[in-house]
């Protein structure tokens, strides 16, 4: 039985708003529907949410499900990084589609920096991530997968996620199972864990789904379960 990645990683939207402007952006639609901020193209920082990091029970957090790291002001990033350093019990994930706009170093042991790649023409983002973000951990999210990315240089990558389009627009996109399997095989050749999102079940079958997490995330989940006993 497949699991939902949202049950393993909690969203903490410290910044809401994005300047990238993807046509299929679910976050923009949600912000407009719930009137979270006035202008989605003008990101806003919510420092009060940083208190969530102080909880002692370990958690895996995605910090920018409704923003792109490239749109964060440097002072926002510095404040968040300092809070991450103070709370090593958690693991924190960041995502960007514009790694070419980033340029920083960090030695944070519990921060993971990733890019979204939806097609072969966007593979440059992986190279830009490694070049512009000098960090301990990298991940790549291949979602929604619009075409066959082909051969991918995954050197230095610590985790990949693979998924397809969801919602009403899913009828316009067809992710071939061969694309997901090719990415999986390439990752496994480098001992990189692969998490296929549950929306791939109709495409590859529930019995074939692969849902692997990095060891650091698994340790967090194990401690969570022990707290529930």
Predicted regions and their residues:
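Hydrophobic faces of well-ordered beta-strands that scaffold small-molecule active sites
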Residues: 61-63, 92-94, 111-115, 138-142, ...
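Short capping loops/turns at secondary-structure boundaries
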Residues: 118, 122, 173-176
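Structural alpha-beta junctions
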Residues: 86-92, 134-137, 184-194
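Conserved Radical SAM active-site core
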Residues: 1-112, 120-134, 149-154
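Auxiliary Fe-S-binding modules of radical SAM enzymes
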Residues: 1-9, 146, 151-229
């Amino acid at each position: 039985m497949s699991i939902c990645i949202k049950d393993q990683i909690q969203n903490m939207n410290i910044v809401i708003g994005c300047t990238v402007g993807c046509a299929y952006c679910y976050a923009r639609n949600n912000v407009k529907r719930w009137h979270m901020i006035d202008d989605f193209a003008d990101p806003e920082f919510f420092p009060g949410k940083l208190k969530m990091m102080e909880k002692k029970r370990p958690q895996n957090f995605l910090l920018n499900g409704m923003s792109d790291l490239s749109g964060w002001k440097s002072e926002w990033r510095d404040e968040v990084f300092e809070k991450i350093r103070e709370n090593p019990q958690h693991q924190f994930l960041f995502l960007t589609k514009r790694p070419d706009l980033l340029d920083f170093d960090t030695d944070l042991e519990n921060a993971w920096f990733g890019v979204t790649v939806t097609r072969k023409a966007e593979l440059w983002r992986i190279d830009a991530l490694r070049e512009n973000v000098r960090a301990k951990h990298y991940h790549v999210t291949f979602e929604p997968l619009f075409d066959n990315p082909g051969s991918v240089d995954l050197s230095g990558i610590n985790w990949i996620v693979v998924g397809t389009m969801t919602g009403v627009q899913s009828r316009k996109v067809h992710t071939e199972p061969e694309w997901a399997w090719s990415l999986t095989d390439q990752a496994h050749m480098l001992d990189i864990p692969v998490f296929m999102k549950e929306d791939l079940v109709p495409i590859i079958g529930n019995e074939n789904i692969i849902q692997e997490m990095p060891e650091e995330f698994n340790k967090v989940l194990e401690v969570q379960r022990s707290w529930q006993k």
